[in-house]
């Protein structure tokens, strides 16, 4: 994803700046095995495509063993069927493996983002995932909203993803994302111009 979006190396550097690394398994492609034998909070950034393709769309996944909750964060807030339709991505297998390996009763709660915070032509999905993981490691019981990291972002229903009347809201979210990273990531500050070019709000139209 050199021309657009975020590389694995870039995401790992930003995650490190955000102090997520102690809980971070790494960046993975669609073959991510799930959270296996994890008795502490842990998280990962997962691409919907195989590594050999260069990547398509980044998701964040996180595991809170205290509440036995599996979090899946998609900046677009796509439904399960839409993820499968658009990206041919299904997470039931890794969710099942996580449940079997990580809980005595093999039962987990799935908590999934279901609203949109990212513009339809934005390539900032990986950066939004880093932001979410910062919220998760600091507020693992309520990472989606009502915390200082994700709280300032405004979500819209997924069916309005392309609605012209909400594009300003999604654009503002991306500006807030950049400001958050400028404040908290030395890597982002050092490479801000290039990162903003590769993840621009209208990148997929270029």
Swiss-Prot record:
Entry EC number(s): 3.4.22.39
Function field = Cleaves viral precursor proteins (pTP, pIIIa, pVI, pVII, pVIII, and pX) inside newly assembled particles giving rise to mature virions. Protease complexed to its cofactor slides along the viral DNA to specifically locate and cleave the viral precursors. Mature virions have a weakened organization compared to the unmature virions, thereby facilitating subsequent uncoating. Without maturation, the particle lacks infectivity and is unable to uncoat. Late in adenovirus infection, in the cytoplasm, may participate in the cytoskeleton destruction. Cleaves host cell cytoskeletal keratins K7 and K18.
Keyword Hydrolase part of the UniProt annotation: yes
Q: Which SUPFAM superfamilies match?
A: Cysteine proteinases
What's the encoding gene here?
Answer: L3
What does the record's miscellaneous section state? All late proteins expressed from the major late promoter are produced by alternative splicing and alternative polyadenylation of the same gene giving rise to non-overlapping ORFs. A leader sequence is present in the N-terminus of all these mRNAs and is recognized by the viral shutoff protein to provide expression although conventional translation via ribosome scanning from the cap has been shut off in the host cell.
Enzyme class label: hydrolase
**Activation and inhibition:** Requires DNA and protease cofactor for maximal activation. Inside nascent virions, becomes partially activated by binding to the viral DNA, allowing it to cleave the cofactor that binds to the protease and fully activates it. Actin, like the viral protease cofactor, seems to act as a cofactor in the cleavage of cytokeratin 18 and of actin itself.
Could you identify this protein by its name?
Protease
Similarity field = Belongs to the peptidase C5 family.
What HAMAP family does the entry give? ADV_PRO
**What is the native source organism of this protein?**
Canine adenovirus serotype 1 (strain CLL)
Q: Which Pfam families match?
A: Peptidase_C5
**Marked site: Cleavage:** 54-55
């Amino acid at each position: 994803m050199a021309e657009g979006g975020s590389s694995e190396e870039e995401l790992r550097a930003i995650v490190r700046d955000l102090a997520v690394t102690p809980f971070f398994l790494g960046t993975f492609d669609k073959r991510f095995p799930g959270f296996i034998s994890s008795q502490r909070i842990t998280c990962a950034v997962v691409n919907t495509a195989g590594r050999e393709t260069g990547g398509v769309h980044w998701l964040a996944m996180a595991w809170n063993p205290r509440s036995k909750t599996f979090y899946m964060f998609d900046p677009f807030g796509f439904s399960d069927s839409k993820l499968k339709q658009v990206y041919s991505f299904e997470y039931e297998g890794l969710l099942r493996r996580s449940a079997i390996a990580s809980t005595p009763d093999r039962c987990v709660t799935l908590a999934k983002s279901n609203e949109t915070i990212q513009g339809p032509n934005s390539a900032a999905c990986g950066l939004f995932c880093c932001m979410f993981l910062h919220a998760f490691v600091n507020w693992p019981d309520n990472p989606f909203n009502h915390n200082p990291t994700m709280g300032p972002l405004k979500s819209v229903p997924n069916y309005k993803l392309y609605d012209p009347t909400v594009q300003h809201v999604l654009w503002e979210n991306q500006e807030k994302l950049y400001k958050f990273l400028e404040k908290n990531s030395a890597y982002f500050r050092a490479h801000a111009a290039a990162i903003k070019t590769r993840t621009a709000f209208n990148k997929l139209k270029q």
